[in-house]
Amino acid sequence: MFSIGSFIILFDEQGRVLLCHRRDLDLWNLPGGGMQSGELPTEAAVREAREETGLEVVIERLVGVYGKADKDELVFAFTGRVIGGRLLPTDEADECRYYAVDAIPANTPPKHVERVHDALLFATQPVFRLQTALSSLQWLQSLQTKGDQT
């Protein structure tokens, strides 16, 4: 089945990016997730930000549209701005915090890091990219396998 995801990239005044630590996996992600039926990508990004962080946000611009070679999935990434709410633990994320772009945790999937870099590098027009990185779960499993071998 084909799925569509939507993520939001939020920078604070110091240029740090907001990441959320997932409850189900030991990963830091950008706020975002799957779109609901009848929902626009912008609406999904705003909803996911609220559900995962407790923050109210507005969309500023489209960063990129990403396909995945091994999955029937399309992902939208936007930058946004916080207009209200406050960071809270949620059902989906046990912690959200801002990180300097050069200090993003090692357990952040490469595809999320790539989207952050795209937000910084391609400020005038969106990027359209096929992301070849492993899925978050596959990537985490590969890290665990490497750890078991050492």
Question: Which positions does each model-derived feature cover?
Answer:
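Hydrophobic pocket-lining residues within nucleotide cofactor-binding pockets
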Residues: 35, 66, 82, 93, ...
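Nudix hydrolase/Nudix homology domain
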Residues: 26-27, 92-150
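Conserved Nudix-box catalytic region and its N-terminal flanking loop in Nudix hydrolases
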Residues: 12-51, 150
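Short, well-ordered beta-strand micro-motif
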Residues: 10, 77-81, 97
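Conserved N-terminal beta-strand and adjoining loop/helix that marks the start
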Residues: 1-17
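Structural detector for helix-capping/boundary residues
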Residues: 33, 47, 60, 99-102
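Active-site segment of metal-dependent pyrophosphate-handling enzymes
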Residues: 54-86
